[in-house]
Every structure is written in structure tokens, then in C-alpha cells.
Amino acid sequence: MLKNQDLDIERKQEHIEINLTKNIESTLKSGFESIQFIHNALPEINYDNIDTTTTFLGKALQAPILISSMTGGTARARDINYRLAEAAQKAGIAMGLGSMRVLLAAADTIKTFAVRHIAPDILLLANIGAVQLNYGVTPKECQYLVDATKADALILHLNVLQELTQPEGNRNWANLLPKIREVINYLSVPVIVKEVGYGLSKQVAKSLIDVGVKTLDIAGSGGTSWSQVEAYRAKNSLQNRIASSFINWGIPTLDSLKMVREISKNVSIIASGGLKSGIDGAKAIRMGANIFGLAGQLLKAVDNSEYLVSEEIQLIIKQLKITMLCTGSRTLKDLTKAEIKL
């Protein structure tokens, strides 16, 4: 029988392959397609003076972009993370690491997550599933993940539906809020709570804010459907049918963004889930996000070369800057007031 860490590594290998080769898109849309910017034909701004810089979690970013968490723990994942880190360093944007539970069981997997030597200046986010706090992971171990990778913050991801569509997934989701509070109080860095593609509701966001969470990654539906990923991993027809039945589950990203921003003007929001371009990112900023995250198209590019992922990031940044010029927005603050049609 495979040990837990071997199962983790096998699952990560399968996840990469499925994400690269299968259609695992949610049937729901992110919602950003319903927003239209009002074109400004005379912006009276020099394109070269467009300013996409921002500060997030105390780090300066050249653009409000996060390479969302993808992978780790395998040789292929190491290559992917190294290329992503190099691209993030070049562009001056943030990067999230994939789930790091395997590192707590297999110390040698650190080489697949350790990218700080490649990207000394980026905002780097360590990552582990929040549910692992119910399965023995301690605040001290969470701090270890941060220290081992020299990360600037820790993501606790919420992946309840994904876990329940895995035959080996974790089932106990009770009493996590007090444990999340403990991690927040223990860690030397900020804690981000993130969904993985089904969105954060108003009620969940309020509960998290009430225990001290100051940064949320809403990760709504409209992009990768992890139940579809698990459907491809299913070992029998029953598992496949259970996972496949949730392809249209979740809160579209735009709806989640509106819900969370409605209950708090102060919480920092990362908008991710189904964003495909810098235009979508601009819409997310306009609707209240501080920064936006992308993963799917970057994974497909980075599996081939660092050059291709850097090119994809430059495309996204140029789309954002052109959108800003064509809405008369010289800065990201200006963009939050751009005229739109819903």
C-alpha cells in the first residue's frame, strides 16, 4: 500500500497531467463577461505614463497580478515552479506555491517548492489546505512551511468540494474557524484564506474576517472545476458520476467579489477563478479587488518554457494597460472609478 506522501505525490502528478490535457472548465461563467467598460476615445493620458504598480501585503508589485497556486512535490512540478518564479521575478508580480502538505511528510520535496533563490524580490505565498488543521497539522508546522520557503504569507485553502469528490479526501470540516484563528495569531506573516474555484459567500467571508483574516482569495467558479479534475482521476464509475455531477457548482467570481466587498471595505481581496486576460483583471479591480490571480493559461504556457509564460504575463499586463488607457485611468485607483455598463 502506498504511504500518504506517495499518494500525495501521485495525486499531484495526476493533477498536472489532467489540467494540461483535459477539458476541466466549469460550465459556469466567471461573470466578468457581463461587464463592459465605456470606451474613452480621448483619454488625455500618455500610454507610457500608465501606472500599474501597487503594494500588497507590504510588497511592491509592478502589476496587480498573482500567479495563482498550482503545484509542487514532483520533479515536473519543480520545473514548473522554477519557471513561474523566474517569470514572476522578471515581471515584478506575486506567486503562490501549490499545496505543501507533502513537505511535512517528505522533507526532500522542499526542492520542488524552494524558489526564493530564483525570485528574491517577489511576493511569495506558501500554501496548505485549511482542513489539514483537523488532521494534525499545527500552527508551528504552518510556520515551518513559511520559513522553509522564505514566503511572505501563508495561504490556507478551502477545497471542501474537491476533497469530497476524492476517494482519499478529507471529510472532517468541523470547528476549523478557531484553528484558523490560532494559525493567524501564531504566524509571523499574514494568512490568506483562499477558495479553489467555487467562491466565498458573504457568510463565509464574514466568519473568516471575524476570526482575524485580513486577506481573502475568493477564487470563484468560471475557471478550473476541481470536481471535473477528480472525475478524470476516478477509479470507478460511481466516483466519476459523483464528481461529474458538480460541474456547474459554485459562486461565479464576480458574484463572490461583490458579496465580499459589500461586507467589508477593508479586507484585501484577490480575485481569481475564470479570469482569462488583463481585461478581466481590470474588471476585477474596477469591481473591488486589490489584485487578481490567474493559473490555467499560465500552466499551459509554463509547461513548455519560461519564455512562453513570460510572454503570456506580458500579454496580460499590456491588456491591462491598454484597458486603463481606453478608460482614462492612469492609475489603478483611477481604474476603480472607470465608467462601466453592467
Swiss-Prot record:
InterPro entries: Aldolase_TIM (IPR013785), FMN-dep_DH (IPR000262), IPdP_isomerase (IPR011179). Its EC number is 5.3.3.2. FMN binds at S68, S69, M70, T71, S99, N127, K194, T224, G274, L275, K276, A295, G296. GO terms for biological process: isoprenoid biosynthetic process. Mg(2+) binds at E163. It is found in: Cytoplasm. One of its GO terms (molecular function) is oxidoreductase activity. Its cofactor is FMN; NADPH; Mg(2+). Keywords: Cytoplasm, Flavoprotein, FMN, Isomerase, Isoprene biosynthesis, Magnesium, Metal-binding, NADP. The keyword rRNA-binding does not apply. One of its GO terms (cellular component) is cytoplasm. It catalyses: isopentenyl diphosphate = dimethylallyl diphosphate. Substrate binds at R11, K12, S99, M100, R101, Q162. Belongs to the IPP isomerase type 2 family. Homooctamer. Dimer of tetramers. Involved in the biosynthesis of isoprenoids. Catalyzes the 1,3-allylic rearrangement of the homoallylic substrate isopentenyl (IPP) to its allylic isomer, dimethylallyl diphosphate (DMAPP). PANTHER family: ISOPENTENYL-DIPHOSPHATE DELTA-ISOMERASE. This is Isopentenyl-diphosphate delta-isomerase. It comes from Rickettsia canadensis (strain McKiel). The lineage of its organism: Bacteria, Pseudomonadati, Pseudomonadota, Alphaproteobacteria, Rickettsiales.
